[in-house]
């Protein structure tokens, strides 16, 4: 189950899962792709997910979710964000530089060969020359992708937007005056794209911080990207936990499914204890982590344990500011 999740995460950069936490189907888990639920257990429980697809597909946060009388833990995994800059002009250079500083894999594409050189973009991971009509052929689809359209005209803008809106993405922004943006929108509406699709485009691009210099515009653009990137609560991948999964370790996966107060790790944080007692990852250290490690060998199948950090209980568990943490224990007899 987790190996499949991490495999698809490596390919797409983003995965959404949901687990049932109560009732007769407790422990059943699915992956949500293209608004459809795909069972990660067996085909016998595939049908039950159809009743929940709409609500699960709409959920954008890692969190607990009630649908009717059924409780779910929805988890959004993200990894390796890609910044794809379409247009190699003067604004693109500082955008690429800042994007690299922020931890993005950076791609720059332009239809002019002399505009996409290593001298102009020393921080880029990938440089592509070609027509903007070739985006689908030259740039693989990737869900955790942030597209910045900064071409020199509305024809280039519409060529880029036309292809990007037919693929998954996390962010799509387009530079230009309001008139240029209006022309592009009208052209795309005439081609059959809907207002709903076009409203996903950040245009004009960037936060309204003022400034006309290329570097100032780049700060505006990347600030909006960071804002969008941090808009939802997601689960960031612990490399040690992923390594244990890939090595098919048997043991217990522990995940924070809810928290309040001052607990140091957020919802979705994971750690894994293998059968030999070796720990991978962390859910925040201290006595909470110690108590979870102590309980893990006794866990049976799918189990939730609540650690009360309020008042004296919090002091005993190393969280004197109070709060509460719920930890999900999943017994992994053979990681698959």
Summary of predicted features, one role per range:
Residues 133-143:
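Short amphipathic alpha-helix with an adjacent loop that forms part of the alpha/beta core around
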Residues 175-243:
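Adenosine-phosphate binding glycine-rich loop
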